[in-house]
Regions:
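Active-site and adjacent substrate-binding regions of carbohydrate-active enzymes
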Residues: 1-299, 305-325
Length: 325
């Protein structure tokens, strides 16, 4: 809704239009889900849930991609956990639409208010040095601010000199976090295909977002996915395995309970539990170092490695994820 003398962003009449659409859809097409794609700071984003029953059913979780990226880049989960611990939904009829990458870049505005501007700029600089492209906006005072990083999520998480084994481990770690969060996860086609930065596409098409929009011939991509020596094969098959595991365990259902905390600055714990009292614990080591963590009364089997967890001390290898049940 546009109105002279205002920013034309998030005006009350915008919300009234959504309420009207929701009322119509609920009557003529019950069961239809409304999702809002608002790439803005978190507090403005969640406003589109309305009262929990009168606007969007799902909201894109735009803060998740840059926060997971920040956690892996800094090898520190504290900012991610601090934000996630405050996630609340207005009703049981709403949930999050979680993602890490899309056909657009990684938005930085959803980080504002969650991280100091100095840390955002530090992240941007580090990614630029590794080959990411950045879109900027001009401020009224003549300065510029970055608003979007253009890069595949694979290359955002790793460095140029990283081995494919490390690239895959970091990438699977990030997507295991995505799959563990409350809500509905979505995985971009370029991500599950293990795509790298497409600089030729940027040069050909003339815009930064082309870096993560490569088009493939079916035979070409099928050949690479079937070649066990390729990064694509490793990413596709390991990520597909995690998705299959997730679908097999009810604890991950969007309506089920969620808690998150830090074991230390590099290890995050996510617990999901259902109405029957069953609990699944995810442990995520975002560092390049082995982490030894002591957790009492955590026994079960790691669904990913298929190893039984018997003692209180658990060893997590660099970038390792465990789903313990």
């Amino acid at each position: 809704w546009k109105e002279p003398g205002t920013s034309c962003i998030h005006l009350e009449k915008t919300h009234l239009i959504i309420k009207l659409l929701r009322s119509i859809i609920d009557n003529v097409a019950p069961g239809t889900v409304i999702i809002t794609e608002t790439n803005v700071p978190h507090k403005d984003n969640i406003a589109y849930f309305g009262a929990g029953d009168d606007e969007a059913h799902m909201v894109y979780q735009f803060s998740l991609p840059p926060l997971v990226l920040h956690a892996v880049q800094k090898q520190n989960v504290e900012a991610l956990c601090a934000w996630a611990q405050n996630l609340t939904l207005p009703s049981s009829n709403t949930t999050w639409f979680n993602f890490l990458a899309s056909h657009d870049g990684i938005g930085l505005n959803p980080l504002r208010g969650l991280l100091p501007e100095s840390e955002i700029l530090e992240l941007v600089e580090a990614l630029q040095q590794e080959g990411a492209l950045v879109n900027w906006k001009n401020n009224p005072d003549g300065t510029r601010s970055p608003y979007e990083i253009n890069v595949t999520y694979m290359d955002a998480l790793s460095r140029r000199e990283s081995s494919d084994e490390e690239r895959c481990a970091r990438f699977i770690l990030a997507h295991a976090i995505l799959l563990s969060f409350p809500g509905v996860p979505a995985i971009y086609i370029q991500s599950i295909l293990g795509s790298r930065n497409d600089y030729a596409g940027v040069e050909k098409l003339g815009y930064n977002r082309a870096i993560n929009r490569k088009k493939y011939h079916s035979k070409e991509i099928t050949r690479e996915l079937n070649d066990e020596a390729t990064l694509r094969h490793a990413v596709y098959h390991e990520l597909s395995r995690l998705i299959t595991l997730r679908r097999s365990h009810n604890e991950f259902h969007p309506d089920n309970n969620f808690t998150i905390d830090t074991i230390n600055s590099s290890v995050m714990r996510i617990q999901r539990s259902n109405a029957d009292g069953n609990c699944l614990t995810g442990l995520f080591n975002v560092s390049k170092n082995i982490q030894h963590v002591n957790i009492t009364n955590l026994h079960g089997r790691d669904l990913i490695s298929e190893v039984d967890i018997l003692g209180n001390e658990i060893t997590l290898h660099p970038w390792q994820v465990m789903w313990i049940k």
